[in-house]
Amino acid sequence: MPRVKRGVTARARHQKIFALAKGYRGRRKNVYRVAKQAVMKAGQYAYRDRRQRKRQFRQLWIVRINAGARENGLSYSKFMNGLKRASIEIDRKVLADLAVFDKAAFAQLVEKAKAALAA
């Protein structure tokens, strides 16, 4: 049985890691053992942060909705309760955009929420 020399496969494996480590600083970009660890850690961060991004955007939307609601004399929780009672189903992303970019439309929603709370 002939001897198998693995130089080609080893080089291909290394090149794959170096391609993923492109743009890194110091030895992380050109020393295989360090680059491999850096790429693995980057993958862990990416996996974790794809989930955190969803939480962070929801937090941001809630902050913006709360600010817009308080400008119109209502807290976030009362505003959301009023919308639910008025059977207005708009998600937080759209509400946050309205609060920032279309204050008049958002003010109308706040008035409808106030009316639903009073009824």
From Swiss-Prot:
The keyword RNA-binding applies. The keyword Ribosomal protein applies. PROSITE patterns: RIBOSOMAL_L20 (PS00937). Transmembrane segments: none annotated. One of its GO terms (cellular component) is ribonucleoprotein complex. GO terms for molecular function: rRNA binding; structural constituent of ribosome. Pfam families: Ribosomal_L20 (PF00453). It comes from the Bacteria. Keywords: Ribonucleoprotein, Ribosomal protein, RNA-binding, rRNA-binding. One of its GO terms (biological process) is translation. PANTHER family: 39S RIBOSOMAL PROTEIN L20. Belongs to the bacterial ribosomal protein bL20 family. Binds directly to 23S ribosomal RNA and is necessary for the in vitro assembly process of the 50S ribosomal subunit. It is not involved in the protein synthesizing functions of that subunit. This is Large ribosomal subunit protein bL20. The gene is rplT.
